């Protein structure tokens, strides 16, 4: 019987290290040629499987694949497309089986966040409910760091490092200008429901470099009066302050401060624009001159300042996914297990997808200071190891050198499928 081929795809928002996971998958699979045949990638996530838009990664050299480890974003294209349940849309699952059969695919690796875990779980059920043998392994990825069970999520450590460094540097800038100009700097970061990225801004200030920073978490209902009082207190004491605000901050009425009524493909509120809202509160309530910025894609694409810890974990979980599949596992996700804080040690674990899909991990209350505007030492102990270590990409003429794969299409064998 012919060796089964593997399918790998990327889903949801991309990160600085998702390609490191792809590198881990492809290199590990190539090392098991006795058990795995071809390694296909789906162009634009699960859509690539449904549309039979497959990429033959075998057309790329070992050197090119290795370069994925230091290349940001999604090498094969990503998507925001959520499979409906089997009962709701059986035709999508029949199509997946049709494509898998046509290309002899027996291994399914899906690299993404919570919604992607849900998609992977649904694909894993093809085996039991529809009789097609498939082993579906989810590879965690999300800058939001909100997947359960795993200690942290690949992608988070690097965005956390970017935010911590940026807040420290911007705070130095504001301090320089505060006497006659800007006194408050507001930066908006990602995080719809969980404040992990915003919390990373707290790392900018430590015992060797104390800085006046206010953090606004999604987990803490926003109180305008308390916020303005805290900003005013810090400006009067230090002459300036920096504010790190999560895009998902809600008022005490439960509504997003930045909700414009839009929704993304997963049905989530399309957020953004909370920084100017908060900055205007400072101007109107306190009269201080301000500047605001939105980190947006910059925070998750910044491979030049990636955390080595994050890169290593991303690669390790991609590698582990293949190893789990070869052991016969299905509907599972490799995880990061923290062994110790000092020294920081971790290992790879495994979690059932049923306990991961559609579950969000919020910031524990004891990670946030009593006033709701900062991080505790417990939080600092959790976050600090995740941003450690440098893993710079190669540079040429002052610019990082990233790889673009050939992404050669696999010839189609089936009729077109309308999504």
Regions found by a protein language model. Name each.
Residues 15-25, 49-50, 91-94, 114-122, ...:
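Short glycine/serine/threonine-rich phosphate/pyrophosphate-binding segments
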Residues 5-15, 74-80, 106-112, 184-189, ...:
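Short glycine-rich or small-residue beta-strand-to-loop segments that form or flank ligand, phosphate
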Residues 256-419:
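C-terminal non-catalytic interaction/assembly regions of soluble proteins
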Residues 2-54:
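N-terminal phosphate-binding or glycine-rich loops at protein starts, especially the Walker A/P-loop
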Residues 99, 110-112, 120-130, 137, ...:
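Accessory alpha-helical/coil subdomains and C-terminal extensions
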Residues 11-13, 42-47, 80-81, 113-114, ...:
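Short, ordered loop/turn segments at secondary-structure junctions
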Residues 52-106, 115-116, 143, 168:
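Glycine-rich oxoanion-binding loops at beta->alpha junctions
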């Amino acid at each position: 019987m012919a060796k089964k081929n593997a399918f790998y795809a990327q889903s949801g928002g991309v990160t600085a290290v998702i390609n490191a996971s792809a590198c881990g998958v492809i290199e590990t699979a190539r090392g098991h040629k006795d058990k795995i045949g071809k390694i296909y990638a789906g162009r634009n996530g699960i859509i690539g499987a449904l549309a039979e838009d497959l990429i033959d990664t075998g057309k790329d050299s070992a050197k090119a694949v290795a370069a994925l480890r230091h290349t940001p974003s999604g090498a094969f294209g990503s998507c925001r497309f959520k499979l409906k349940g089997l009962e709701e849309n059986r035709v999508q699952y029949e199509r997946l089986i049709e494509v898998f059969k046509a290309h002899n695919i027996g291994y399914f690796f899906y690299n993404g966040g919570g919604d992607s875990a849900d998609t992977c779980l649904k694909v894993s059920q093809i085996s039991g409910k529809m009789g097609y043998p498939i082993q579906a392994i989810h590879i965690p990825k999300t800058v939001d760091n909100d997947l359960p069970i795993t200690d942290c999520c690949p992608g988070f450590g690097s965005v956390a490092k970017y935010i911590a460094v940026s807040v420290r540097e911007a705070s130095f800038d504001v301090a320089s200008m505060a006497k006659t100009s800007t006194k408050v700097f507001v930066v908006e970061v990602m995080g719809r429901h969980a404040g992990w990225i915003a919390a990373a801004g707290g790392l900018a200030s430590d015992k060797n470099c104390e800085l006046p920073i206010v953090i606004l978490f999604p987990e803490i209902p926003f109180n305008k009066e308390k916020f303005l009082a805290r900003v005013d207190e810090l400006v009067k004491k230090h002459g300036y302050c920096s504010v790190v605000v999560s895009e998902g901050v809600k008022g005490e009425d439960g509504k997003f401060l930045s909700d414009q009524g839009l929704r993304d493909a997963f049905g989530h509120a399309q957020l953004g624009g909370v920084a100017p809202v908060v900055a205007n509160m400072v101007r109107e309530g306190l009269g201080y001159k301000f500047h605001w910025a939105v980190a947006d894609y910059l925070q998750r694409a910044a491979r030049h300042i990636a955390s080595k810890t994050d890169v290593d974990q991303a690669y390790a979980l991609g590698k582990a996914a293949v190893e789990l599949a070869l052991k016969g596992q299905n509907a599972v996700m490799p995880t990061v297990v923290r062994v110790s804080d000092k020294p920081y040690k971790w290992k790879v674990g495994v979690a059932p997808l049923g306990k991961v899909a559609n579950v969000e991990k919020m910031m524990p209350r004891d990670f946030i200071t009593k006033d709701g505007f900062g991080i505790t030492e417990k939080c600092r102990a959790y976050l600090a190891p995740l941003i450690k270590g440098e893993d710079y990409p190669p540079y040429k003429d002052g610019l990082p050198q990233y790889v673009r794969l050939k992404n050669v299409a696999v010839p189609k064998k089936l009729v077109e499928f309308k999504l």
